Amino acid sequence: MTDPLSIAPRDQAEILARALPYIRRFHGKTMVIKYGGNAMTDPALQADFAEDVVLLKLVGMNPVVVHGGGPQIETALNRLGKKGVFIQGMRVTDAETMEVVEWVLAGQVQQDIVGLINQAGGKAVGLTGRDGAMIRAQKLKMVDSKDSSIEHDIGQVGDIVSIDPSVVKALQDDAFIPVISPIGFGENNESYNINADVVASKLATVLQAQKLVLLTNTPGVLDKKGNLLTDLTAREIDALFADGTISGGMLPKIAGALDAAKAGVHAVHIIDGRVPHAMLLEILTDQAFGTMIRSH
């Protein structure tokens, strides 16, 4: 993080003045942030992220954090002698893996994020989809992306049936910052592991968020030559799916982002979480950053 004392006072004032139009525009608006990738594992980036979230809250916005935890889950599974298996970007989740996922996400990762935000001066509260009966889910039916006659059984991976945002809204009204682990529950009280990008996208839609911001380990969406695609429409995304440019873990991320854009979320951005204070650059400046997803 840049030491504010190293910046000349006039430059500090200029930075704050330039942010004012964005603070005014987004005051009272909800920002759903998917927190994942290197930003979750690098201590300096962790601190930057927490400070960014607290700043957004202090200037009158309503940040809601949905977090991943893939690397942490993988580490825990390796300690148990299990190897993670992925199909079309989704983790195959048997009963034992589901126990690990719940423990790592809700018991470790979520609490670390809550602690960092609170340490930075915010008031964060950790939730899973079980809290307040927020995220109801059912077993995901995964059809093969190349052969629709094939259906993959990936265990306790959930497809969202509904989201009740009342607990999130209640926390926002009391000046708390919700931090949500992507775990849902089924009709028989079984747990489901749900892709965090999908949860963030659906939650942004239900909350009628002003922005959905997805932090990644890349500058945004890249073409096959590695060039950044700064603006994508639904038609362009379909073409990138078809030719294999978008694959693996980016599949659910982009699909969820597009669904949110189609459902009326005002702005959907995929940005590089490896950049210090990436969120502030996206929300409080006019700097072109990452990839913007549009429905048309």
UniProtKB/Swiss-Prot annotation:
Known pathway: Amino-acid biosynthesis; L-arginine biosynthesis; N(2)-acetyl-L-ornithine from L-glutamate: step 2/4
Coiled-coil ranges from the UniProt annotation: none
Subcellular location: Cytoplasm
Source domain of life: Bacteria
EC supergroup of this enzyme: transferase
Protein keywords: Amino-acid biosynthesis, Arginine biosynthesis, ATP-binding, Cytoplasm, Kinase, Nucleotide-binding, Transferase
Residues reported in the UniProt entry to bind substrate: G69, G70, R91, N193
Family: Belongs to the acetylglutamate kinase family. ArgB subfamily.
NCBIfam families xrefs: argB (TIGR00761)
Protein name in UniProt: Acetylglutamate kinase
